[in-house]
């Protein structure tokens, strides 16, 4: 597979040897605890997995606090739960050795230097192995996140599968709804890679073997969300993002390699021609989507650490919303750069929405950037492009640019009946949507647009607030911010 991988990604360097590591979820949490001690909170009081875990996340969000939460005592199970791991851009950036503002650049730089996985004989995830009648998913924490959810869900499930036609590997996030001791539903996003693998398997009248990873280093999460060619095998991306080779071990029941230092692995198959009612479920959009027919996952084996943690994602909260931003922004930055080389930054501020900052050299580049975004990611349906003098991390400044540099009849692009997300509650039918782009750049260019009013730079630079305002007032203002 390494040779095939090299051929399909000739522009990227593959490192086949790397130093053995301890790159796992626990080591990441410990790293966060050491560097940002306020970012890890352990709760020893018993918590009910039905609503209380999400309620605690929501209560802390109301206080503008987003720590990793470790629940040591979860009602009805021996397994602790960890959630809110991704609820900080600072933590996600730290997972790839970066600062928050440079996370996209660091992501793109790292995935240019791929690191092959390192196969080992065994690992912590093999400490307990359950097969056949020993399998009981009900022993795992049964977390119900929102009041309208149809039942318990596994929301941090990273699915690993091999295409039965091409032999290519893929990792992706797929939610699982508990059905019984050895079955769940599985949500396959329309037209994505795992959906295509499963479609190929159904055409062959066979199940699709998959392994589901529950609890691994955030590099697995970020790599699983990478948007790339179907020829890419994300194992190499995981190592690149972590900066170390990922240790893998053979699965118990299939010809797949799984992360040796995961917390829990589910092995099984997505059954052909079988569907089950799934949902309602509260999604990342903030809405509870209704019941739909979904595929069925039959679990044949579970392996886990003796003291395994169940990784949960607080659906629809910051933990969920931030996770996809860095890989999606990186993909969009790369796509826009191919069309507009002077792109400066990309930001996803809300579901289905993206801001793009460019240094416009010629008229028309604003709309070129819009088309590049809409063609690069099915999920994106609203694009706002601004000049490089606008801070796209400041929503107010972006809206100021829309209000002062845009004319709707000239600068708004609307495309009807195109492929989008089947999780969008506003679409008319599964995955079909309308998309809009707003070119909020100055016309024809920033340097020839109506000048902005400014306080002279030398006056701003030389003025010190402490010379005019009491220190006690300044300190009070700092405490409130």
Where are these regions (language model features)?
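Extended, highly charged
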Residues: 2-296, 300-480
């Amino acid at each position: 597979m390494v040779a095939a991988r090299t051929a399909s990604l000739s522009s990227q360097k593959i490192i086949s040897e790397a130093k053995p590591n301890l790159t796992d979820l626990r080591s990441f949490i410990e790293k966060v605890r050491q560097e940002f001690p306020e970012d890890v909170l352990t709760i020893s009081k018993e918590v009910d997995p039905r609503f209380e875990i999400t309620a605690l996340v929501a209560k802390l969000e109301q206080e503008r606090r987003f720590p990793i939460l470790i629940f040591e005592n979860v009602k009805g199970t021996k397994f602790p739960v960890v959630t809110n791991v991704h609820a900080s851009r600072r933590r996600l950036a730290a997972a790839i050795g970066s600062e928050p503002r440079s996370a996209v650049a660091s992501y793109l730089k790292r995935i240019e230097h791929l690191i092959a996985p390192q196969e080992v004989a065994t690992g912590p995830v093999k400490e307990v192995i359950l097969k056949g009648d020993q399998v009981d998913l009900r022993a795992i924490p049964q977390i119900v996140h929102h009041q309208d959810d149809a039942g318990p869900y596994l929301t941090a499930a990273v699915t690993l599968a091999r295409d039965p036609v091409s032999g290519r590997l893929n990792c992706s996030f797929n939610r699982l709804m508990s059905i019984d001791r050895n079955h769940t539903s599985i949500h396959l996003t329309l037209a994505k890679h795992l959906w295509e693998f499963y479609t190929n398997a159904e055409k062959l009248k066979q199940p699709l073997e998959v392994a589901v990873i529950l609890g691994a280093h955030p590099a697995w999460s970020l790599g699983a969300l990478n948007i790339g060619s179907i020829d890419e095998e994300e194992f190499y991306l995981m190592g690149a993002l972590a900066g170390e080779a990922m240790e893998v071990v053979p699965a118990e029941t299939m010809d797949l390699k799984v992360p040796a230092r995961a917390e829990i692995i589910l092995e099984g198959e997505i059954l052909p021609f079988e569907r089950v009612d799934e949902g309602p479920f509260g999604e990342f959009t903030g809405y509870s989507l209704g019941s739909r027919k979904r595929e069925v996952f039959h679990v044949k084996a579970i392996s886990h650490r003796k003291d395994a943690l169940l990784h949960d994602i607080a659906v629809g909260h910051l933990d969920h919303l931030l996770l996809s931003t860095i890989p999606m922004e990186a993909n969009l930055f790369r796509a826009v750069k191919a069309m507009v080389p002077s792109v400066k930054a990309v930001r996803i501020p809300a579901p289905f929405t993206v801001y793009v900052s460019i240094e416009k050299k010629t008229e028309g580049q604003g709309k070129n950037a819009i088309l590049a975004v809409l063609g690069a990611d099915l999920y994106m349906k609203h694009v706002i492009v601004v000049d490089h003098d606008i801070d796209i991390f400041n929503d107010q400044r972006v809206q100021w640019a829309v209000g002062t540099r845009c004319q709707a009849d000239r600068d708004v692009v609307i495309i009807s009946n195109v492929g989008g997300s089947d999780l969008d509650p506003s679409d008319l039918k599964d995955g079909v949507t309308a998309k809009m782009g707003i070119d909020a750049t100055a016309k024809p260019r920033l340097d020839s647009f109506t000048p902005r009013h400014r306080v002279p730079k030398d006056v701003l630079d030389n003025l010190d607030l402490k010379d005019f305002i009491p220190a006690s007032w300044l300190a009070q203002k700092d405490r409130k911010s």
